[in-house]
Swiss-Prot record:
Chain intervals for the UniProt region annotation (Disordered): 1-55
Enzyme class: transferase
Chain intervals with Polar residues compositional bias: 22-35
Alphabetically ordered keywords of this record: Endoplasmic reticulum, Lipid biosynthesis, Lipid metabolism, Membrane, Methyltransferase, Phospholipid biosynthesis, Phospholipid metabolism, S-adenosyl-L-methionine, Transferase, Transmembrane, Transmembrane helix
Identification of the protein by name: Phosphatidylethanolamine N-methyltransferase
Localization, UniProt: Endoplasmic reticulum membrane
Amino acid sequence: MSSSAADPFAARLNSDVRQRHPTASATSKNVEGTSQQKQQQQQQQSEANAAASRVKKTYGKTPDGTVFVVPTTHDMVTQLLDPREPKNLSDVAVLAIIALHFLAAYYLPWGVKRPLFAAIFMFWRLAYNVGIGYLLTIQSKYKLLVTWAKRWKLFENPATGKNPRPWLYNLLKKELETKIPQDYKFEEAPIEYNTWLTFRRVVDLILMCDFISYCLFAIVCAHKPDGEGLFMCFARWAAGITLVGFNLWVKLDAHRVVKDYAWYWGDFFYLIEQELTFDGVFELAPHPMYSIGYAGYYGISMMAASYDVLFISIIAHAAQFAFLVIVENPHIEKTYNPPQPRVRCESEAGSQLQEFASEYSVPSTTGRHDNTPLPVHNLIGLKNLDFFRITDVAIVLLCAYLAVVTMVTPNTRFYQALFVLHALAWRLWYSAGLGVILTMQSEEKMFTRHFLKYGESVGEAWRQWKGIYHLSNCLCHASFIAASYKMYEFPADWTYGWALLKHVVGLSLIALQVWTATSIYESLGEFGWFYGDFFFDSKRQLTYTSIYRFLNNPERVFGTAGLWGAALITWSRAIFLMALAGHFLTLAFLAYVEKPHMQKVYGRNLRDDAGVTKFIKRSLPPPVTEWQQSIDKVLDETKHFIDEFVDAARSRLATGSSTIVKDTSALFNKYPARLTLSKISPDLAGYDPKHYGLSLAGTRVVGTNEKATGKESPNARVLKDVKTQAFEYGAPIRVKWTAPANHSKKDWVGLYMVTDNRSREVTEVPSLGRWVPTNPGEYDTTTDQGILVWDQPVEKKSEDTDLVEGEMVFEGDKLWWTQGVFEFRYHHGGGHHVMSISEPFEIQIPKFDDEHMGVDISGEVGERAVEAALLPVIRNCLDRDPDIAPSNAEERFGGHVERDGKYARRVVYAIRHMFGIDFAPAVVLADGNVRRLAWRICHAKEVLAPFSMSHTNGRTTPVDSKFSE
């Protein structure tokens, strides 16, 4: 949130304060002794204090721009349990439901309690993650909760005569005003704020019952393990209480920072006009309320000494992470991190990341390789696996060989030792061997010089290095997994000893390492993952995002957690030593390879302390801080002495390689809104389909007619008089409809493929979001956006009925992004009974035929022709949105293209059918403008020209002259 919008209020209130203070000061100097002036002074001072207090008030803004004072509210525990807080009917209902939980835990038979409370807790957990998640999702996307409140007139004053339920209005008014005695009037508050307050009461019930049912389930399952000693019992309870206390502190500190506004997802309804400051626990871990904020679950599991409680805690925690990923993160991205405005001028097109140009330095007659597109064929991830690439083939084959050998060899001590030594060798090569190569590359560009020596380019050196590093990384971890498999023994009894707990903790550590690696890759991108700044002079600035916001070197702490997890699961000395060696080698790599290079490249731009370090330093008492500073001073002096002695002065602080390539976490709008099939409406009597009609208008395709190609019989070559309309791929289509004046306000028009429906009377398939209602305000979703005109009287041409007309536009996600033959269907009354069908029309992508155009695709003229043909298609694919679609060939695409993969998929589909070139969607993201895409298309067509079937681009057989007779 930005504070700029709040500045006018602050400026106005501050001016009131400034105007009153001089008056009070002058009065006290001139007539200080009089009681009258003292009273004036006190009155003016109180006014100044009141103004100052108004300055501190929080202001909110609704989506329509309404600004209001956000009153102070209290958390649910205080509202429910503090006797000093006023109570109302909803509080009594919540407390009564909680009391029922306690009564059930006390009176039910012992054998019923455990499964019953497990089911009760899972019910409330689903109500939280699924129920609240669904409500928040539809509110974020469609403002549907506010729409429902408006439709049901929940907050409409009964005095207007428009509220059908005055009793409900009075109940809500009493409920909400009782809780907020200051700065709040039910009648004057925006509907978004009142809706949020009502939503809060539902959340209070779910959250309280969720927590209470979990605690009662833990109490029901609690027991003392057989044979547990006093020391172990004390340690278990001490650790559990510590985790619960830590959990309590996390929740309280998080609430201190975000207040009720973020605690109850207020930004789904309105925004507050002030800067967001995240300190305290928010510097300790990402999403602390969902990550370390659930530490208490595991503390309670320890105190209960129950695996049932532990497993249900893990399930609940996983469900909470799913809630975060599916519900909260998309809304956070949309609200606080919108795509950057599109760059209007592409002045840097030829210079941006020029070091990558050599990767595509192939011979060309254009000589324009200064504007070469970026490489896009990434290595990391299963989605990038390519069996036409030698690195991927080698990794798959070697891992397959390793897996086969692991499975077929016996688990004798000889083979176990052999596999452990094999894994150790790969670990040494991965950390020490590659570390030496990177050190020499940093100091004297050794790796690059080797390829330049044989006439290769810097890009070739970079590609080969990525392959070596990727292969080494995969084989290092695969060999460790194979060694762990050889040393693992399946437990004969999972309930004996610590067998089950070791597996749970071990798998958690492995998951932690996987998450850490994923976060690092998302932050650094492919360039940083493969240490690109060792090969190229990077001009990027260090930015600390994602996991690097909290840790300078996440690999130091969490990067080897999976090794210790495997050691815990296998419970093997050899694997433990392997984990120890791997951790030590990782620390050595960071200290002796990465840190010196980072110091040399980024220098003073390196950050001193990460978020966790800052938090710990601020939390220490002053004596400890002074002692720590003195120790640091002694260590620094000793370190400098040693560094000077060995002539290897290096910085004390270490940071991770933080060269950032843009975050490609795109939000995929994969599942559009859909309509549910319904029965034929019974109120069709009196509606004649002949009074309904649809007509279309759109951008027609300009090109040759290919329907008569000379391959038909002579009679079939005659073109028909009535031509089917053909519109451009992705171009908006305007639909004009006609209907009787008394038509249903819930009528709607949908777009379908002609072959999707067998019946002409009833539509048989869902519209999948490709529909627009005829009248606004009749449906809850955002379908009204396509309505242009509705219910305009039509000049009367027949005496039997009065007609009205309207107009709507289908664009963006309401279109089919494929070629084919389509039709619009007019439906009656919110159902699927068809009243009218438009004439069929085609969606076409005109082919770019350089042969008939007489254009040399390998020349600059050819590139310009491709640009001219490609630009309107790209604009259609990007919805013709000025914030996304370029106006010329040099302008970059908008930031939405990186966020939402649908745009890139539209573009590559169009290029495939227009030019016959199949690109990956990542190519569109890397090129970023039409000019680079045109260059890539021309280059691809030039390379593929010898394999083309056309005469101008080459022949399939080397025929240079006619056959001799």
